[in-house]
């Protein structure tokens, strides 16, 4: 194991890396590139804060920089199979960061921010419906948003 001060280090220091890149539980990761920076988020089930935001310059060395959701709704206080933030999608469009995710019992939620290191908006239910997971937001050339 490549460890430094008890911390897992995937970067071998010679231009190569060792798997796993992240020695942690970040299920269903989604990554975007904004300029020279990469940002990642992952599913959150009963753990808070929720929707972790990680940053990297090389997709090997990642740092946890924020959480998009500081408190999940009360229904997440007790573990329930299928309950939680499923496969979030992080996107950057027109100067804003967005995260969309599906809760299979309720529908698709969204949160956004102008500053990925700052506060994120309250969660907004954008599409009600059961079984909606694995969202993929896109914007067309006219700026209209779609969820695929």
Please describe what each predicted stretch is.
Residues 1-148:
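Carbohydrate-active catalytic/glycan-binding domains of CAZyme proteins
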């Amino acid at each position: 194991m490549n460890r430094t001060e008890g911390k897992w280090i995937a970067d071998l220091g010679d231009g190569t890396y060792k798997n796993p890149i992240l020695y942690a539980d970040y299920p269903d990761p989604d990554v975007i590139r904004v300029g020279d920076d990469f940002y990642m988020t992952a599913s959150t089930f009963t753990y808070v804060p929720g929707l972790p935001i990680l940053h990297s310059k090389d997709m090997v060395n990642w740092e946890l920089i924020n959480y998009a959701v500081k408190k999940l709704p009360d229904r997440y206080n007790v573990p329930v199979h299928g309950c939680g933030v499923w496969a979030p999608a992080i996107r950057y469009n027109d100067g804003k960061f967005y995260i969309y995710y599906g809760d299979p019992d309720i529908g698709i939620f969204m949160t956004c921010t102008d500053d990925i290191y700052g506060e994120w908006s309250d969660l907004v239910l954008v599409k009600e419906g059961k079984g909606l997971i694995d969202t993929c937001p896109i914007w067309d050339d006219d700026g209209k948003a779609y969820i695929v």
